[in-house]
Amino acid sequence: MISKLSVNPTFSPSYNIIVDSVLDFSHILEYVTNKQVLVVTNTTVAKLYLTKFLAALVDDLDVRTCILEDGEQYKSQQSLDKILSTLLENHFTRNSTVLVALGGGVIGDITGFAAAIYQRGIDFIQIPTTLLSQVDSSVGGKTAINHQLGKNMIGAFYQPKVVYTSIEFYKTLPQREYIAGMAEVVKYAFISKDFYLWLDSNRDKILAKDSVTLIEMVKRSCQIKAQVVAMDEKELTGARAILNFGHTFGHAIEKCQNYRGLKHGEAVGVGMAQAIDFSHYLGLISQQQAKDFNDFIVSFGISIDFPNDICQKEFLEAMLLDKKNSNKELKFILIENIGSLSLQKQSKNELEQFLDISR
């Protein structure tokens, strides 16, 4: 069973997202029109899927691999340099090269950024292997590496040639990673009331990993993101900002833990709860709404407990570095109801007071 949908960005060519019930890498062959292929993956995914992927490629291709360490802390300049050096050392050229990102969000982000900047742009293909990367980072063209002062601070908007994935990847995906991915899925429920109701009615099947339901879940999540990206590919109008619900707080958590604590999806889960509570503090939603929204997050096995190893001063400093901020104004994606999120400016003092009473 294959589900296919199209992403139509504002400034870039359209591309397909292919969600497969089985794992058949041959589906990407029609998109490998270049003769030089560099497969970027990590040590974990390489052991599980690299051999099978390489076996699916035709014999007349010049195929090389670049295997990075696994973890958010390796979404770095050093890892980027390793990819670029591999391309240069093997004389890969702009018009004959395609990069393949075989892995989760870190691999997709860093490979996409390498594709964006190598010889001013080469083709790349996304093969996301985690739920989080399937529904979020592989779609929409955001590519980046982290800096020691902030997450995703160095990057570019650059769309893939195609996204191919399969729910078969879940067979080797640790439960913790699966639940982390569910945080991004739940985020879309706060953006779309229809999806909120669908998730609510299919919760048991989702937690039981029913294959038909999971394919539909991934497809619906990608559709919501694709619709937003089509309106505001490069965050010029502000429409795309709603996709960052939970991320302002979440990114700050990751930064404070040096990307070695909560996983990205876990941090987003906590971040959504923080954004919900901040919305209540500001009078945008009632206490009952805040409870209902947080209970919805928790019902999918997602923790909303704030880490106790982060001090408030450090957390506040990390939030001040958020990319949405401008002219020293803090910007947050806040909630007024299901399907009603908005980008709002708040003062540093308002945030400090909220953090004081919420700890």
From Swiss-Prot:
Gene transcribed to yield this protein: aroB
Primary location class: cytoplasm
Cofactor: how bound: Binds 1 divalent metal cation per subunit. Can use either Co(2+) or Zn(2+).
CC annotations in GO: cytoplasm
GO biological process, one term: amino acid biosynthetic process
Matches recorded under SUPFAM superfamilies: Dehydroquinate synthase-like (SSF56796)
Lineage: Bacteria, Pseudomonadati, Pseudomonadota, Gammaproteobacteria, Thiotrichales
Family the UniProt entry places it in: Belongs to the sugar phosphate cyclases superfamily. Dehydroquinate synthase family.
Compartments (UniProt record): Cytoplasm
Assigned EC number: 4.2.3.4
Binding locations of Zn(2+): 184, 247, 264
Residues annotated to bind NAD(+): 42, 70-75, 105-109, 129-130, 142, 151, 169-172
Purpose: Catalyzes the conversion of 3-deoxy-D-arabino-heptulosonate 7-phosphate (DAHP) to dehydroquinate (DHQ).
InterPro entries attached to this UniProt entry: Dehydroquinate_synthase (IPR050071), DHQ_synth_AroB (IPR016037), DHQ_synth_fam (IPR030963), DHQS/DOIS_N (IPR030960), DHQS_C (IPR056179)
Name of the protein in question: 3-dehydroquinate synthase
Principal EC category: lyase
Molecular functions (GO terms): 3-dehydroquinate synthase activity; metal ion binding; nucleotide binding
